[in-house]
Amino acid sequence: MKVKVTLSAVQFRSLVDYESRSFHLDLGEGSTLGDAVRAVEEMLSAEIEPLLERGNVRIMMNNSLVDYQKEKNRVLNDGDALIFITPISGG
């Protein structure tokens, strides 16, 4: 199964060049959101899960914000899109 990943979070700028920030992951059937995060961690040689757990990086899945702590065991489907973003606040 293929899942599209886009790394838009500021934290990834030093790890991947602009042209490489969007790519497809090949994952086995039944893979979860947590499996995808671990695959990206392995690919980048970086720890992403702690950033997600602290809320420094968030994931949008198919244009909806995901609570990683609650949904890391969510099973992915072929064609799902994951965007890693930096949360923005202000007023």
Curated annotation (Swiss-Prot):
Disulfide bonds: none annotated. InterPro entries: Beta-grasp_dom_sf, Mopterin_synth/thiamin_S_b, ThiS/MoaD-like. SUPFAM superfamilies: MoaD/ThiS. CDD domains: Ubl_MoaD_like. Gene3D superfamilies: 3.10.20.30. Pfam families: ThiS. This is Uncharacterized protein AF_0022. It comes from Archaeoglobus fulgidus (strain ATCC 49558 / DSM 4304 / JCM 9628 / NBRC 100126 / VC-16).
